[in-house]
Amino acid sequence: MAEVKPHHYDVIRRPLITEKSTLVAEQNKIIFEVAPDADKKAIKEAVEVLFKVSVTKVNTLTQKGKTKRFRGFEGRRSDVKKAIVTLAEGQSVDISTGL
């Protein structure tokens, strides 16, 4: 495996721990919030290096930010890019320990 580099920590922002993410964890999948400019190759490399696991597939999606109003002013929340990472059979990651 490759060595850990500082840009790996820039690619993966945080794991998303929701009801849905705990359900897909049973299927050997982990959901991360990633940098908006990160591509699938960079996400795969970062997960493999940081967590020392092998990744079989990476799916990404961009959740558009909502428009919100506050005291007559209209603003917009930031977009969020998520990655659903599928691990190889028999591999797991304990995301509660952190990076």
Swiss-Prot record:
A GO BP entry: translation
Gene Ontology MF term list: rRNA binding; structural constituent of ribosome
Coiled-coil residue windows: none
GO cellular component: ribonucleoprotein complex; ribosome
Record keywords, A-Z: Ribonucleoprotein, Ribosomal protein, RNA-binding, rRNA-binding
Family: Belongs to the universal ribosomal protein uL23 family.
Function: One of the early assembly proteins it binds 23S rRNA. One of the proteins that surrounds the polypeptide exit tunnel on the outside of the ribosome. Forms the main docking site for trigger factor binding to the ribosome.
Subunit comment: Part of the 50S ribosomal subunit. Contacts protein L29, and trigger factor when it is bound to the ribosome.
Record protein name field: Large ribosomal subunit protein uL23
Taxonomy of the source species: Bacteria, Pseudomonadati, Pseudomonadota, Alphaproteobacteria, Hyphomonadales
Gene this protein is translated from: rplW
